[in-house]
């Protein structure tokens, strides 16, 4: 279960970073 949470956290972090990056590009 902990591994799944870690995977989800990584996905969320990546999505947040992508959103921030897109804002910078735009």
UniProtKB/Swiss-Prot annotation:
Keywords: Amphibian defense peptide, Antibiotic, Antimicrobial, Secreted. Its main location: secreted. Expressed by the skin glands. Antimicrobial peptide. Active against the Gram-positive bacteria S.aureus FDA209P (MIC=35.5 ug/ml) and B.subtilis ATCC 6633 (MIC>64 ug/ml), but not active against the Gram-negative bacterium E.coli or the fungus C.albicans. GO terms for biological process: defense response to bacterium. It is found in: Secreted. One of its GO terms (cellular component) is extracellular region. This is Guentherin.
């Amino acid at each position: 279960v902990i591994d799944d949470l870690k995977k989800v956290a990584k996905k969320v972090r990546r999505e947040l970073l992508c959103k921030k990056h897109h804002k910078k590009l735009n």
